[in-house]
Amino acid sequence: MANTDAQNDGLREKLVAINRVAKVVKGGRQFGFTALAVVGDGDGQVGFGYGKAREVPAAIQKAMEKARANMKRVHLDGGTLQYAVTANHGSSKVYMQPASAGTGIIAGGAMRAVFEVVGVQDVLAKAIGSRNPINVVRATIKGLTDVDSPDAVAARRGKKVEDIVG
């Protein structure tokens, strides 16, 4: 399901989904392909891309290029999340919570691909509602980018980082 390629720029690439689509025209059906890909550096940066083309390799190439252009920063706590978070996109809802070291990635499908490329090693996650891969990837990335760093939380509350982290 998820395909990994190591490029020379050090980014991890995963192919999440490929779909065959059809456009009905007067002469019959015109087939095309869509590809959903996620790209990350394994250290807190992640992006996703959705490519469409008449051939599978071209769709994958477009998806990878869009993912590289759409990179976002995520604040991680070692190999896990800072705190539990919920995010929505469309009717897809994802719940993610930090896990102790050695737990691994307890997540399914499209969420697992995002966690692997962003550099999360230990997380508990669940997709609720629609499990459409595009919406699940969007919700997962939205949730990860909404997590604030301890520095930002401390500054907002007017406290020291040590008081926040405990």
Swiss-Prot record:
Subunit structure, interactors included: Part of the 30S ribosomal subunit. Contacts proteins S4 and S8.
SUPFAM superfamilies, sorted: dsRNA-binding domain-like, Ribosomal protein S5 domain 2-like
Family according to the record: Belongs to the universal ribosomal protein uS5 family.
Pfam families: Ribosomal_S5, Ribosomal_S5_C
Protein name as catalogued: Small ribosomal subunit protein uS5
Function summary: With S4 and S12 plays an important role in translational accuracy. Located at the back of the 30S subunit body where it stabilizes the conformation of the head with respect to the body.
Comment block on domains: The N-terminal domain interacts with the head of the 30S subunit; the C-terminal domain interacts with the body and contacts protein S4. The interaction surface between S4 and S5 is involved in control of translational fidelity.
GO molecular function, one term: structural constituent of ribosome
Gene Ontology BP, a term: translation
Transmembrane segments: none
PANTHER family the UniProt entry points to: MITOCHONDRIAL RIBOSOMAL PROTEIN S5
